[in-house]
């Protein structure tokens, strides 16, 4: 067994897969539904090849688009319970994302639990968004909000609740996951508890 011979056997016991299917199909086959996609948003601000816009402009556009679609299902910005931040722990990204969250959620931004699971996984590049969406589904299912580990000395300009150091329990019905990329590419997806 090539995988076990290289010591990777345990890696394959801890994986996630997202299956996206229509509600009627999932219900007909008796699938366990971990969450329902409320909406998504994408933007490309093309501000800089590697740096995000300092005001979070492009990120805010993607988040607003996702929220706009969620509002069609009766979900308001004040109902967002958890955000899985892009959170790469770089000064420009974290400050820009903080500003974007504040622009989009207003005062509610201070009530939302936020964490960066990249603090535990590292940056998974093209796989990051899928894993972080799966994390959001598990947060909805379990009510366990993962921590942002190693957040000992947060930047004073990043003053939201980034769930430092320890996981917390909370009732979570609506989540948002942010993914930003080089060249100003921004994406946001929102999930909610299936009822």
Language-model-derived ranges and their functions:
Residues 6, 40-54, 87-94, 111-161:
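Acyl-CoA/ACP chain-elongation machinery
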Residues 10-34:
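Channel- or pocket-lining gating/hinge segments that regulate access to a cavity or pore
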Residues 19, 37, 80, 85-86, ...:
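Conserved small-residue
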Residues 25-30, 63-82, 104-108:
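Phosphate/pyrophosphate-binding loops at sites that engage ATP/ADP/AMP, CoA/4′-phosphopantetheine
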Residues 73-77, 110, 159-195:
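Flexible, low-complexity linker/loop segments at domain and module junctions
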